[in-house]
Amino acid sequence: MNHYLTPDLCDAYPELVQVLEPMFSNFGGRDSFGGEIVTIKCFEDNSLVKEQAELKGNGKVLVVDGGGSLRCALLGDMIAEKAAKNGWEGLVIYGCIRDVDVIAQTDLGVQALASHPKKTEKRGLGDLNVPVTFAGVTFHPGQYIYADNNGVIISPSPLKMPE
């Protein structure tokens, strides 16, 4: 597991990084995480989040555009544990999560807007690997994302921590 410091990455790569608007909180068991972006666009339906968590995700971060909904949770403990088991580095969710105490103990990076106790409906709706826009940034599959307690940044290519 790599450790990332977003301020250091911003200083080292000012021409490459874009910084997300500061609206996310760190809920996961990892203080920092990063990797190649896989995107999901969904609204109050986490079917695709569950499907992707069940696949191998080594070196990847799931970026979920949940429309900023504060009415239900797109991630809970069971999906988070499955994602960790399958090697995902983390998830950045423009929406809510639940089971926060368990997720805080899970070896997975999780950034989201808030917690909410209600689960989503599973209707099989959503789009995978499409450009998504939130927090002042457009995310494309194959870009790279890095997150820590300071914030979240993206880059068109992988970044190495400065010496």
From Swiss-Prot:
It comes from the Bacteria. It catalyses: 4-hydroxy-4-methyl-2-oxoglutarate = 2 pyruvate; oxaloacetate + H(+) = pyruvate + CO2. InterPro entries: RraA, RraA/RraA-like, RraA/RraA-like_sf. Pfam families: RraA-like. It is an enzyme of class 4 (lyase). Divalent metal cation. Belongs to the class II aldolase/RraA-like family. This is Putative 4-hydroxy-4-methyl-2-oxoglutarate aldolase. It comes from Pseudomonas fluorescens (strain Pf0-1).
